[in-house]
Amino acid sequence: MKKKIAEYEVGEQVDVFLLIKTATKGLASNGKPFLTVILQDPSGDIEAKLWDVSPEVEKQYVAETIVKVAGDILNYKGRIQLRVKQIRVANENEVTDISDFVEKAPVKKEDMVEKITQYIFEMRNPNIQRLTRHLLNKHQNEFLEYPAATKNHHEFVSGLAYHVVSMLDLAKAISNLYPSLDKDLLYAGVILHDLGKVIELSGPISTTYTLEGNLLGHISIMVNEIGKAADELNIDAEEVLILQHIVLSHHGKAEWGSPKPPLVKEAEILHYIDNLDAKMNMMDRALGRTKPGEYTERVFALDNRSFYKPTFHN
């Protein structure tokens, strides 16, 4: 059985089928065009460069194209890359389905639905429960398929739902430790905070930003969705405004994408939970590709740091 791309080490030769996740055009210092491609399989992704590309080649190597690649793995300025020696578009008889090349959440969709439904069932505030259930039902199919982001954390199929389930478990543990927290508000905030990404993002494979995503962003989208849901359900209560604020402020600061900072206790806690789960996912995935006694590649979203894996962590 062939190794997956994340299992290769620096210096090893590669000859595999991979899916182009993204392809971005650039211009080298010599004035010649090149492509930066992100290649993926179910284990993760890796960056590669295609130099001196012609317009015809650019049209060949686009997102959602399966390619046969030969080359070697190298460490370039702390980041793992694939140096391409040969590349071609795969023939139809060589590969089966694009879905065979994408990373997926480690939990079944049915199990995640069951868990999230249980958290909604535990809500005691009828306004919060109805709003949350209504919005989740409206977007459930996409919610269970979409990633949580295009890069950095939970950027895999069903990553959005997996991120939410992990955050709900964190919210429950924190609420048990601090009983003054409104669990209904916190659980609803967790479920709704990134739900706008089903409109912001294009889909589960080769994910990009939609027009709405580029012009509005998932935070503004979800604030509007909560308002529409309240109108549809004839809910005219303060809970609507507080839920909108929780979504609006969950990035914490204006420079991080939130127009308002958290001004409600549950909004502040949601920001911490979101940040913690995202960073844990980044570290776990980077360390999962690292041997004990070695450092990870640099993690851009974590201040470009490399994390050490202790020798006693087998």
UniProtKB/Swiss-Prot annotation:
Q: Which UniProt keywords apply?
A: Exonuclease, Hydrolase, Nuclease
Q: Does the keyword rRNA-binding apply?
A: no
**UniProt-listed InterPro entries:** 3'-5'_exoribonuclease_YhaM (IPR020873), HD/PDEase_dom (IPR003607), HD_domain (IPR006674), NA-bd_OB-fold (IPR012340), NA-bd_OB_tRNA (IPR004365), YhaM_exoribonuc/phosphodiest (IPR050798)
**Can the keyword Hydrolase be found in this entry's annotation?**
yes
Q: Which family is this protein grouped under?
A: Belongs to the YhaM family.
The gene that this protein is the product of is: yhaM
Enzyme's top EC category: hydrolase
Cited NCBIfam families: PRK13480.1
Q: How is this protein named in the record?
A: 3'-5' exoribonuclease YhaM
Q: Which residues form the HD domain?
A: 163-279
- State the Gene Ontology BP annotations: rRNA 3'-end processing
Q: What is its EC number?
A: 3.1.-.-
Q: Name one Pfam family in it.
A: tRNA_anti-codon
The protein's job, in short, is: Shows a 3'-5' exoribonuclease activity.
Q: What is the lineage of its organism?
A: Bacteria, Bacillati, Bacillota, Bacilli, Bacillales
Tree of life domain: Bacteria
Care to name a GO molecular-function term for this sequence?
Answer: nucleic acid binding
In terms of Gene3D superfamilies, this protein maps to: Hypothetical protein af1432, Nucleic acid-binding proteins
